[in-house]
Amino acid sequence: MVSTPSPKTKVYLLEQRKNQELNIEHIDEEMRLEQVRQAASKMEWTSFGQAVRRNLLEKRNTIDADGRIDVLNGIAYMKTKMPIEENNLMEEKIRVMAESLGCLHKQTSRGWSINRQEDLIMDFTVNDGEVTTVVLSFWEEPSFYSPEATRMLQLGMWTELRNRISDMLLTYDKLLSRDDRRNCMGAMRMLEMLFGHFSQDPSYTSIHRSNYGFYLPRNDLRAGRVYYLAEPHFRNIRSKDHIFQLQKDDHEVLPYFEFSFAKHDSPCTLPEFDTKGWAESIEANAVICMKLSRGFNLTETTRKKLGAISAKTPSVKHFTNSYRYVTGAVKIENNLQMITQFGDGQTQHFYNVDVNQLRNDGDSVITEIYLKHLQDFHEIIAILRNEAMHISLWESMISACYEKQGMKKHTVAAIKMDVFLTREQIVITFDTKFAPVKVVIQDSGVCEAKVNVVHAQTGLQIAEKIDETLSRKLNETWSIPNMLTYAVSGSDCNLAKIKVPLRSENPETVGPIPTYAAGRSF
């Protein structure tokens, strides 16, 4: 039976939800009803809280299951990154730290304890409201006193300590089974032993050339690191101060990677050490992960090469064009033209790069590499070093062409050069008074480049001695503009008159970023 409403009664017809799509009309009616509910009750905080809670409970059913999971994951992630306010009470700081690490916490006779089963135990001794000692235990290993953690808390660096603890816990994937993690921990001890034995030389040359780089052992709050690259320019700068070995202030400057273990869908073999040496004899649903300290700019060709010897595809941060990415430009419409900034009176190089070489976005910036077999480690290191050299050679051209802000307009004499970029080779062609010349740069070994100078039309070698000289200069500096000054001079060519600066915009914001001024963090 349907009752007939009185003429003065307003009837709201609420649409029944038929699907999970957002219904604006329904939400609007709900808001109107909520206003009526609040007006009918005393407006005090308790009543207001009850009304809001009731409203939220009604709305909760409109979120689908996937949406709820996304929301919960988002909240959990935000909790791990929430800052810990230094001015909060001790109990509040302990609570926030524990929650952000996914731990339980409790008060003890000495202070506080934070615990996550099988992963972490942190015991704090507190006197007069200040932390006096911090004792740590990771992955059920023996507990130890951490001077660094104690110092950080005494300086009020609660958030920084939490972040470093969180990074340590990433060593073993939380999805690993107990048995797999135990096998991974054994493999980690073997890796530490192996690298501790074969990478003891901290010299920059050894870091750059050794098959194992240099291993910096794990400490209280940092995983072990393998440093694998020290570019010639960096070594030259340090040598001016008579420094030839890795220093503490180099730890965050030079590229490195850390070992960790990630869950894998299928069993992989892990290294084990016995009296006969090490062998890959243990199986686990886990894979050795080489976590790079910063994004690594990788061409598509090299990524495929890495994939052939990896347990799975390297983790890609984003896809890009490696050569355009280094310039700092999101998009380049026309041919890229740059001119060197050599000293006054010197002949400049005017580089022209075909825009088509800067458009393909099949390259990538990667963050992690997954080892299939430990014996392939040295091959992966060689691939990374050669790739770093290739990208640095291109960076050297951009760096040499950086136009400083406030440059007055003037005309310079320059040699016009066309640049062709591929992963296999970098080709630079230009005309001289005697013949058209082509300079071809290719990899010849680990962190070694080979330069061939040939006739651009016939392909005949100009002179073997020139090739040797240019190869040596390029490997000493990793600088193509510097190398080219030994290949050609202004008197050998018909020079063009170029008006500079080439760009009318502020080069500090839109121009190519110099490699050594901005660093190589991707």
Swiss-Prot record:
Gene Ontology CC: nucleus
Keyword set includes Flavoprotein: no
Cellular compartment(s): Nucleus
The keyword Ribosomal protein belongs to this UniProt entry's keyword annotation: no
Swiss-Prot/TrEMBL keywords: Activator, Coiled coil, Nucleus, Transcription, Transcription regulation
Coiled coil: 13-40
Known role: Component of the Mediator complex, a coactivator involved in the regulated transcription of nearly all RNA polymerase II-dependent genes. Mediator functions as a bridge to convey information from gene-specific regulatory proteins to the basal RNA polymerase II transcription machinery. Mediator is recruited to promoters by direct interactions with regulatory proteins and serves as a scaffold for the assembly of a functional preinitiation complex with RNA polymerase II and the general transcription factors.
Family recorded in the similarity comment: Belongs to the Mediator complex subunit 1 family.
Assembly: Component of the Mediator complex.
Protein name (database record): Mediator of RNA polymerase II transcription subunit 1.2
